[in-house]
Amino acid sequence: MKPMVLNTNKFQTACFFYMLFFSITIFAQEPADFVNPFIGTSNYGAAFPGPIAPRGMASISPFNVAGVKNTPMEKDSQWLSNPYVNENTFLTGFSQVNLSGVGCPELGVILLMPTTGNVEIDHLKYGSTYSNEVAKAAYYSVNIDKYKVKGEFTASKRVGISRFTFPKGQSNILLNLGLGLTNEEGAMIKVVSSTEIEGMRSVGSFCYNSPEDAYPVYFVAQFSKPADKFGVWKKPAKYNGVEAQWMGYNGKARIMENTIKTVVGDSIGSYFTYKFDKQETVEVKIGISYVSIDNARENLAKEVGNRSFDAIYKETYNEWNEELSKILVEGGTKDDNTIFYTALYHTLIHPNTLNDINGQYPVIKRTKIAKTDDTRYTVFSLWDTYRNVHPLMSLVYPKQQSDMIKSMLTMFDENGWLPKWELNSTETFTMVGDPASIVITDTYMRGIRDYDVNKAYYAMLKGADNVENNPLRPGLKDYIKKGYLTTDNKGPVSTTQEYNISDYSISLMANEFGDKDNVKRFKERSLSYRKLFDKNLNLLRPRTPDGKWYEPFDPNSGANFEENVGFIEGNAWQYNFMVPHDIIGLKKLMGGDQAFSAQLQKIFDTKQFDMANEPDIANPYLFNYVKGEEYKAQEMVKKLVREYFKNEPKGLPGNDDTGTMSAWLVYSMMGIYPISPGDPIYTITAPMFHRVTIKLDPRYYKKDSIVIERQINNGGKINSIELNGKTLNSFFISHDDFVNGTKLKVIQN
């Protein structure tokens, strides 16, 4: 028998491949692992780093925007719409309901705060610096320096779960209902037992509108360990005058120990106190409801029950990973993957779930409680999201988008109008235009039609034609008569443009219904922006009620949210190309391709382009309408992605606007963009990954997936585009062709 001789070369080769496989296996990351919730927590991105489930009602955010130590980014020192700012250093609790990427302060209430030592109820005194923050999908942790307490947080859809690790000695958990981001006041609290608190916090007046529409958010908090002592506090208003002389307690905080009575007021809260002989952990589960305390308790019991913090975290992490895995990317850097999947994560926060686990939810104006077998969604920032978020949902998450349309139609049943900027069954009517019509049309034209389309069409026509007491379209009578709004109205040019886009979408729906008269009527209405086009300036400008040009006119006025006569949140340059349904017509108005391209280029050269402002975010793609200049779109999109979107807290260009900036990034990195909302088309640019696989929902699409592939990685211009091996003759592709294809290949020089 010959002795065994080891082949050293083969052994080394085998070891190399084994170690390579082992390394890949060990370090392989799921899409959810790339999420960095700190992105957008600075530079007014208005994101928060704490945990939330996909489309979750409950969320937890560190609250660090109260107190002079956080100036200038303090909630009462400027217009601040987020509960957390990355640069701030003073923490006063962890809010249990929050909004992500909105432009006005709201929610950010029901603040939980762990402390040690004697009970202190003044947040400016019990607040603390913090360190060692960790944030990832479904999880956030932080060390609270003053008390040497570690806080960990996760969430299910309707329940927030906190885990505090306390040192030996007296420890406290405070529940503060007075402090919050909202400008609304009023709360109720009751200690049910040594392990449970229930209550309500009033919120509302979003963007300082309709304070009479304030509404309650209910909660039930359950603690894993019974408190040794508990109590409730109340800070009353201070009286003046004769009565004040007799009130020895005037304006003084009251602490009611071991009481189980219900306490109401503006600045109230509760505390649980523990005496620990060694390091201990306490878990707090807080169920949320917009219907009742009983529903909050049921949400907690049925959604979480007795399961542990770690079990809930794992479940919510898996939910995130399932949603994010609908798009798989290959060939990018770690930072590319991080900004991409974090952006996709941000698009899956709002709209979010409003109904409780039993299906109940409050209707608009809260006249009654209704029930759904689907999901009742809320937080529709439609002026922002109609441009790209909802088209993205239709492509990747069509069932969610369908339920969003159903939610919008039930809002029409409840309120008589389609939503404009709806928040927790309160219609705020914030911003301008009639964006719901665009979203419904866009969804329908992409083949998602499992809702009452007849009701949808009727609702769209009501909003477009009712000239009396129409909250969706102020100034509609002038618009129909003259074709535009005059300077008697706020933002007349931009509002005219928004009405035009909505009217175009209605003409598309009318065509689907065979309603020829309305096809013609609304198509004509959609082109009326042309009456505001000044050929001497190649710009849109406002007209006065007598039809004359408004003077003095400064096309630069309006940038950076400066008030101006013609436009809402923008200026003439930023709005000049916002006619996505009539770019061909705009080119003719400007004098042809070269004049159009030159005017478009001027926006970028003179730094009028605002990446953080919705009206102009499609501008980089408009070069695709000029034959031979498509390369400018490719260069500009890549430049903007690299300049404004980064793996850092300042990694968004500004307010995320409930996912709109993030959706722009998702599309741009994939190499397609929904250039004309309502029209089911995409324009194409260079993908930033070698390969993108979009998994399609078989309930709505025939194919399992569509692949976008970049053939050459040298950053050159696109030489040709192929769909299933056949060359496309343009930089545009219909939604149907795209989802019924197999591979879209972008070939670069």
Label the predicted regions.
Residues 2-16:
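Bacterial N-terminal signal peptides that target proteins for export
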Residues 29-390, 394-438, 444-497, 510-531, ...:
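Accessory carbohydrate-recognition regions in carbohydrate-active enzymes
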Residues 699-705, 745-749:
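Terminal leader/tail segments of proteins
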Residues 710-725:
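Surface-exposed interfaces of beta-sheet-rich extracellular modules
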